[in-house]
Amino acid sequence: DLSKPAPQPKQDPWEFWTHVKDHSVHIHVKDAIWDPAKNDADYTLPGEGAGAVHRILKDALASGYDAGISIEPHLAVVFHDDSKKASDQEIYDSYVNYGRALNALIAKIQAEIKDA
């Protein structure tokens, strides 16, 4: 988070969301858990990482957000990391699985909002 003094901490996704949500017309979902030993992220399904995905999507949907949501799984491959290799089928399956997980998370959130 370059808005903080050095040494900069990792950006807090919820804090960031609170500053941009009124200007957001698109939500891009990628979730992960930071591994300081590797100095890199372990990517997860949406809502399973430290990206506050559930909280952010719930806030957005409860506030009437009805625009686009895109995914960037990084589970099978990472475009900027040549060390991760996967077949075309594995990449395809990863995107489908990630999309289904996001759909399930959104359905859960919608039920939570309805029951609130």
Regions found by a protein language model. Give the residues of each.
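Histidine-acidic metal/acid-base catalytic patches
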Residues: 2-116
